Design a protein with these regions (language model features):
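Ser/Thr-centric signal marking residues that sit
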Residues: 8, 118, 141
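GNAT-family acyltransferases
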Residues: 1-102, 107-110, 123-131, 144, ...
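Conserved GNAT acetyl-CoA-binding A-motif
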Residues: 131-140
Length: 197
């Protein structure tokens, strides 16, 4: 999947490149220049540790997953002091189903509970479903992560219950699914649009 720039009401979703991920792994000044945004000292979010970033870099540069795409979320709110990196989100292939894509996201603690994740996921969904072979988007989250559950519910995902060991998903998580047909029937008003390159 080729990520394209996405603009929502308050966010620029910047597609990652090998260069961006390389900078994130060791040179936040360069990352700041590449994103044209401040990179907070607390970056990256806890879920995006060095191991995860290294795997993203490998998938991006080696093109091992045809459904891998990732965006860095830059807050670019009119009237704000400047652009700030606040989170990220991306997609990857489901192990057992070529028509399902997995979605994940994370936001820095200082920027949580402001609606950024909901806004970004709403912006990502039309881009994901623009790939006609994708019929389902799946996400997982832990039951105690209430804010993450709210993001999924607000963006139209339905809870499918606890995930099972052996499905390639983390045991103890809840599964959520957004079917293309349900999304097309109830298109969310995200205000997002792919940006011309």
């Amino acid at each position: 999947m080729t990520a394209q720039p996405i603009r929502t009401r308050r966010l620029d979703l910047v597609p990652v490149t090998g260069e961006i991920l390389s900078a994130d792994l060791g040179d936040h000044k360069r990352l700041s220049r590449l994103l044209e945004a401040e990179v907070p000292a607390a970056w990256p979010p806890a879920e995006m540790n060095h191991e995860v970033l290294s795997e993203f870099y490998r998938m991006e540069t080696e093109k091992t997953d045809p459904l891998f795409a990732c965006w860095y979320w830059v807050l670019d709110e009119p009237g704000a002091a400047g652009r700030v990196l606040v989170g990220s989100g991306g997609t990857g292939s489901a192990i057992s189903d070529q028509k399902t894509v997995l979605i994940g996201y994370s936001v820095l603690d200082a920027f949580q509970n402001r609606g950024y994740a909901t806004e970004a996921v709403q912006g990502m969904i039309p881009v994901i479903f623009s790939h006609t072979r994708i019929s389902r988007i799946m996400a997982t989250t832990f039951p105690e992560l209430k804010a993450s559950i709210r993001v999924l519910e607000k963006t139209g995902f339905a809870c499918t219950g606890p995930t099972l060991a052996g499905d390639g998903l983390e045991e103890g998580t809840l599964g959520f699914v957004l079917e293309r047909g349900a999304w097309e029937t109830h298109l969310p008003a995200s205000g997002s649009r792919p940006r011309d390159s």
